[in-house]
Curated annotation (Swiss-Prot):
SUPFAM superfamilies on file: Glutamyl tRNA-reductase catalytic, N-terminal domain, Glutamyl tRNA-reductase dimerization domain, NAD(P)-binding Rossmann-fold domains
The keyword Ion transport is annotated on this UniProt entry: no
GO biological process: protoporphyrinogen IX biosynthetic process from glutamate
Active site residues per record: C50
Note: During catalysis, the active site Cys acts as a nucleophile attacking the alpha-carbonyl group of tRNA-bound glutamate with the formation of a thioester intermediate between enzyme and glutamate, and the concomitant release of tRNA(Glu). The thioester intermediate is finally reduced by direct hydride transfer from NADPH, to form the product GSA.
UniProt-recorded name of the protein: Glutamyl-tRNA reductase
Family, as annotated: Belongs to the glutamyl-tRNA reductase family.
Keywords, alphabetical: NADP, Oxidoreductase, Porphyrin biosynthesis
């Protein structure tokens, strides 16, 4: 049984496809149960964000597991299987562990080192726990990934700038407004309308406040949540008010920016609602999108959304910063520790079985001896039993210790080397010429897995 990841992200798929696979809590729960309904899959956890959809599962069969996950995604999203195969990537066993550590550390995010992803992975884990779909394998891997993410953020300077997708979006909006995002208060004298009152909206309000916004207007379907967000802004020293969600369009003519992060079923901002001649900067932080793209066709109206942010991130620099190198070193360290522990854990059942078998053989031989030598006194018999058990324990002690040490290492070992290592034998010099074997690559069976796009790993340079 090994961990399998099947997913797609901003690196492998267009936003339009990511939108179709985006899952709310209800769909994620249904999809998780559908995954567990497949015989090849025993655990399941789904990470669904604006920039990625990844299924983490544990499978008894790689090929069957991949096909089962793809079929479930097809059933959940309505996207045909061939389209999915063209954009999905696959990670398995150690590569799957590495991928989760890289993702949770923010090293595969659209904004390098962004902190939101660690919370999103934690939320996905908590949801899977509630569904009863997390077992020992995903529990251990997720906890290691979360620990690694915390180390990356606390031990490196990767998030010194407080980068997140929200800050990236607001900074892009400032540039398009002709404002200097590096200035102390570039939004001084400006007013913004924030639609939604969840985590993304709260982050947006915070970032707008840091950028010197003069006033915030909040609107949300649940009025109390909008009022609570406004109170937080007031406590931070930013003037704020609340408008009814259905009356949000009435605020368009008195704001400079509209930031939307509601995840609504319908567009929150439509072209017909924008007053003629209005000058607006629209920022859409939702997936699927909140703001109708057609709004950007209106004179004086500009738009930043997830798709445009993807394009901007691809146009950014490609060099690796020192903090990224430090972060990758932490990932490698944690990955080595995790994979070693997993290999040791995997060998424990075999070691236990070996000890049980040896104990059983010893007991059987003692029974035979007792029948053949009935005249042995109880005191003498007690010494015989102790001696036999000591011999068995001494014979097995070094092999069981060494097999765990060998299991912790990656790579393979020859049979004669294994015997020498396990039992502490002297090197067996052989005068015979070593046997050689050749393999014709063309004769190897076709792997037959779905197509996948390479994503950066802890041993690769970020795009």
């Amino acid at each position: 049984m090994s961990v399998l990841i099947v997913g797609m992200s901003h690196r492998s798929a267009p936003v339009s496809l990511l939108e179709r696979l985006s899952m709310d809590d209800s769909v994620r729960g249904e999809t998780t149960q559908a995954l567990l309904g497949r015989a090849s899959l025993s655990e399941a956890l789904i990470v669904s964000t604006c920039n990625r959809l990844e299924v983490y599962t544990v499978t008894s069969s790689f090929h069957t597991g991949v096909n089962d996950v793809v079929e479930v995604l097809h059933e959940a999203s309505g996207v045909d299987i061939e389209t999915l195969r063209g954009y999905l990537y696959v990670r398995y066993a150690d590569a799957a562990a590495e991928h989760m550590l890289v993702v949770t550390s923010g090293l595969d995010s659209m904004v390098l080192g962004e902190q939101q992803i660690i919370g999103q992975v934690r939320t996905a884990y908590q949801a899977a726990n509630e569904y009863g779909s997390v077992g020992p394998a995903l529990h251990s891997l997720t906890q290691t990934a979360l620990h690694t993410g915390k180390r990356v953020h606390s031990e490196t300077a990767i998030d010194d700038a407080g980068a997140s997708m929200v800050s990236f979006a607001v900074d892009r909006a400032l540039v398009q407004m002709g404002l200097d995002s590096e200035a102390e208060a570039p939004l001084s004298g400006k007013t913004a309308l924030v639609l939604g009152a969840g985590a993304m909206s709260s982050l947006a309000a915070t970032h707008l406040g840091r950028a010197g916004i003069s006033k915030l207007i909040m609107a949300n379907r649940t009025l109390e949540r909008a009022e609570r967000l406004a109170e937080h802004s007031l406590e931070a020293g930013v003037p704020a008010e609340v408008v009814e969600y259905d009356q949000r369009a009435s605020a368009y003519n008195r704001v400079d920016l509209v930031v939307s992060a509601t995840g609504a079923d319908d567009f929150t901002v439509k072209p017909e609602d924008i007053p003629e001649g209005a000058s607006l900067m629209l920022v859409d932080l939702s997936m699927p999108r909140d703001i109708d793209d057609a709004c950007a066709d209106l004179p004086g109206v500009d738009l930043v959304n997830i798709e445009r942010l993807h394009k901007a991130s691809r146009e950014g620099g490609s060099g690796m910063a020192p903090s990224e190198e430090e972060a990758l070193a932490i990932v490698r360290e944690e990955l080595d520790s995790f994979t070693s522990e997993q290999r040791i854990r995997d060998i424990v059942p075999a070691v236990s079985a070996l000890r049980r078998q040896a104990a059983s053989v010893g007991s059987d031989e003692l029974d035979r001896l007792r029948q053949r030598a009935p005249g042995i006194s109880e005191v003498e018999w007690g010494e015989v039993e102790k001696t036999v058990r000591r011999v068995v324990d001494k014979l097995l002690h070094q092999p069981t210790v060494r097999v765990k040490e060998l299991a912790a290492r990656s790579g393979s070992i020859s049979y004669d080397s294994a015997l020498q290592e396990l039992f502490g034998l002297e090197s067996l010099a052989s005068t015979a010429a070593p046997a050689t074997t050749s393999v014709n690559a063309s004769e190897l069976p076709d792997a037959g897995i779905v197509a996948f796009v390479n994503a950066p790993s802890a041993t690769q340079t970020r795009e």
